[in-house]
Amino acid sequence: MRPMRIFLNDDRHVMAKHSVVYPTQEELEAVQNMVSHTERALKAVSDWIDQQEKDSGIEQENPEPEETETTEEGKDSEAKTGENPTRTLRGVMRVGLVAKGLLLKGDLDLELVLLCRDKPTISLLKRVADNLVLQFETVSEDKYEVVQNIREASIVIKNTKEPPLTLHIRLTSPLVREEVEKLSAGETLTVSDPPDVLDRHKCLAALASLRHAKWFQARANGLKSCVIVIRVLRDLCTRVPTWEPLRGWPLELLCEKAIGTANRPMGAGEALRRVLECLSSGILMPDGPGLYDPCEKDASDALEHLERQQREDITQSAQHALRLAAFGQLHKVLGMDPLPTKMPKKTKIEIPIIDYTVQIPPSTTYAMPALKRPIEEDGEDKSPSKKKKKIQKKDEKSEPPQAMNALMRLNQLKPGLQYKLISQTGPVHAPIFTMSVEVDDKTFEASGPSKKTAKLHVAVKVLQDMGLPTGIDEKEESVDESEEKPVLQTPSQTADSEQADSSAGDQSESGKQQGPILTRHGKNPVMELNEKRRGLKYELISETGGSHDKRFIMEVEVDGVKFQGNGSNKKVAKAYAALSALEKLFPDYTTYTEAPKKKRPPMMPRGGPKFAGKHNQGFGMMYNEVPPPQVMRGRGRGGMNRGRGRGRGGFGGGNYGGYMNSGGYGGGYGGNNYQTSATAGYSQFYSNGGASGNAGGGGAGSGGYSSYYQGEGYNAPTPPKPFVKKPPPPQQQQQPPPQHASNPPKPSYNQGYQGHQGGQQQQQPQQQQQQTYNQNQYSNYGPPQKQKGGYNQGTQGAASAGSYNYSNSYTGGTACRVRQWRGCRRARRPALTQRQALVTTQGRTPAMVQPAVPHRTKVTHSRTTIKVPPDRTTAALQIITSPLREEQEVMAGIQITT
């Protein structure tokens, strides 16, 4: 499994640090020589002691009660050693760094454990040490110094050359632990110990180190990256004093626990980060879970020797190291310089692969005991799927390595050949490359769907010319030929079948490079067979080959006949099986044509009753509850759905209420309202409490709501203006209504730019007309024109903060005039729905005006009913209705009701 990509940089740093701290080959050879020489010398000492005992006829007494009362653990330990229990020295075992393979550069202390039949004594230690000096002279030419350390119950051996190594041989016996267990169980000992017996605690520690070595070899050595991480952390414990108390057995247990509980193999960088996460979680803290020692019968904490302050310091240091690793600064934790992001390309140098797990080969002097009992495989526990996977793995291992292809063979025979691209033909999706190579003054050319395939075909030609094997698998060719035989059986299409057979043979040779497998009709065989026979099932018959070159055989049953196909994947195998079935069962089938599809009815306009058309109803800020009727598509600016002039529609176009009902945000494209003020579009909702001096905000005759809440007021809808290339005739100036002296007119936020109007836009005391972009913004950027009196430019004399803003109304002394568009064009006048507009009387009392709907084809002057609340006095009101070109003003009669 590939390591996770996010930890690749950490993996590089950890492996670089590991290569620095890993001992050199010379150091490992020196350790190997010293350990092997000592083991051979101890074997000779054991033989010498045995021979002396046999010659003298004196054997050490083994009391019968002691033999009969040995515990099961003692019997197991004797069985594990595999040595003769009658020998005084039963065997020597490697422990510590040597057995676990955790040696670092500069580690000079080595350990061995010498197992004795009885409890080791001082006399036995001296006897072994004295004879060991003599045996070293016969075993090796190297000089070794032997020192007796009775206090530590060990023999110390030192070499006399570089590097200066020190080897400790610790004497112990399984009887020491058996005696301790008896005492803890409350039993009395019937046999007294010799007076010169060695320290019991030292012997127990030697036995524990032996158990630790066996456990480590069984559990930690098999974990990926575990040994590497332990070596790196051992170096960290040496460099950082805070981590020093964790060095040794607790560190090994911790790393095995953190890495062994992962659900997948991890790289070195990810494994190190997982160990840091485990430490940062507080496993060392006094109230934490602790670290169980698996090599002890009684439950014991392997961290009991750590003090509280040491636990906190290590946890804090691990948390800091984890932060550095998270921010890409793992090199600071490892004590190294950061590596470059991109390594320079170097020529490959053959370097012998180093096995980082096993540093020193096992001993050949003594037969090493079995690390664990053999696994008892029970048929009930093993699932069939696991057995199948194991069988497949065994088959993959037993398969011979794949042979070289033609290109590899040719490169070995003729290194340094230059392949040239001659031409590239064919369409973009299926190119054909032609490559050439010159070998021995001969030029060979071949084609293929890719440059790599073309080079391979060229190599095949060269090898065939040289009379050498090309590396093509003949077995695959024979299988593919047998699959293509049904094509040859059709007598009516002999020539076509021969061509198909040759093309199929080419496809079988290089199926991966030839693209999809198709029938003679250019269809996928599986799809075409499914058109003939529905519900076919393809079964996987076999799966062979390694992970890099698998072969699948699929089978399909059609009309009681089974057809097989093979390929590099299941899809290709299914295609070949279907192709074989088609050629066998349907040799003369005609081209399949699909039935004409039924024409579907036209789609209804999107939306429900609330949104009758695509763009006839805006739904951004607010909308009408009753949808207006759908109108024919307009041709001018701001049409219903689309327009062909400037400003085509937008959201809601100009006929109905979209965003602000003037086409787009704040009078956008539909009504040509490119407003530039800070309150454009939404100013009528928020600026000045809903009342501004001008009826701006929504645009010229804007159909947007003039107040924030729906239903409190509505402006008369504005049909779009026709697109006319020549400038329109000047409009008649309208007399503004009289103003109150106490309320001067206020400037509008939406009056637009007036910089190009020249001197024709002078302010008049009696009439302050303010032109906005809402009537025709394009005229402002042309040459100076005559000022036009547009709609939505009057002022409100009676408006004040908090009152309503009526964008199309003029308020005056006792009368109020409402301007209303009558039509859009002469020939086509869009229908106006019945609306309700607000007008004001002299006392600023809201009254509802209900104009009648004008007809589409002719101008009518209808009556308008104004409803005034009964508690207010009524007054005669005049409504001035004007057509598009304002040729005349028509006065309509009004009826006032209470």
From Swiss-Prot:
SMART domains: DSRM, DZF. A motif (Bipartite nuclear localization signal) lies at residues 372-390. It comes from the Eukaryota. CDD domains: DSRM_ILF3_rpt1, DSRM_ILF3_rpt2. Residues 61-71, 474-483 have a biased composition (Acidic residues). The keyword Secreted does not apply. PANTHER family: INTERLEUKIN ENHANCER-BINDING FACTOR 3, ZINC FINGER RNA-BINDING PROTEIN. This is Interleukin enhancer-binding factor 3-B. It comes from Xenopus laevis.
